C-alpha cells in the first residue's frame, strides 16, 4: 500500500512525502523531500485531522490514539505521529528517510486522511524540559502541511 502527501505553506516552504507499507501490519517507509526551509532541524509530525481549511492550524494536535506523551520515533512512549526531525542544509533543502513501526496505512493507526506538518523549530523529542516538550516537542509554528492520501500503486 502506498500514500502521498503534497505539503505547502508559508514563505515558499514545500515538500512531498511518500509512504510505503508492504504488508498490513508491517512497518511504513517514509521518504520526504523539502525545499524553502531555514538550515537546521525541523519537527515533523502526523497531526490528527485532515483539515487544512484554516491552514495548518486546523490540523489539530499530533496523532495520538494511544494517549501517550510526546517522544522520539525510537521511544516506546510517544505519539503515533511523532516522526522526529527533518534536517535542512544551508540551501534550504532536506531529505528524510525512515522506517516507522507505529504509523500505518490501515487499521487503528492509519494516517490516511490525516495531515503531515513540518514545524519551524527543532523537535526536542520530549527531552527539552520546556512545558511543551512532552506535548509538541516545543517545535514551534507550522511551516507547511498537507493531507495524506492513498497513492496509485
Swiss-Prot record:
CC annotations in GO: cytoplasm
Residues noted as binding Cu cation in the record, renumbered to the chain: 45, 47, 62, 119
Cofactor(s) required for function per UniProt: Cu cation; Zn(2+)
Pfam families: Sod_Cu
The organism's place on the tree of life at top rank: Eukaryota
Cofactor: binding comment: Binds 1 copper ion per subunit. Binds 1 zinc ion per subunit.
Cysteine pairings via disulfide bonds: 56-145
Positions that bind Zn(2+): 62, 70, 79, 82
Reactions this protein catalyses: 2 superoxide + 2 H(+) = H2O2 + O2
Entry annotated with the keyword Lipid metabolism: no
Keyword annotations from UniProtKB, A to Z: Antioxidant, Copper, Cytoplasm, Disulfide bond, Metal-binding, Oxidoreductase, Zinc
Subcellular location(s) of the protein: Cytoplasm
EC number(s) recorded for this UniProt protein: 1.15.1.1
GO molecular function terms noted in the UniProt entry: copper ion binding; superoxide dismutase activity
Enzyme class: oxidoreductase
Gene3D superfamilies in alphabetical order: Superoxide dismutase, copper/zinc binding domain
Known partners and oligomeric status: Homodimer.
Role: Destroys radicals which are normally produced within the cells and which are toxic to biological systems.
Family stated for the protein in its record: Belongs to the Cu-Zn superoxide dismutase family.
Protein name, entry field: Superoxide dismutase [Cu-Zn]
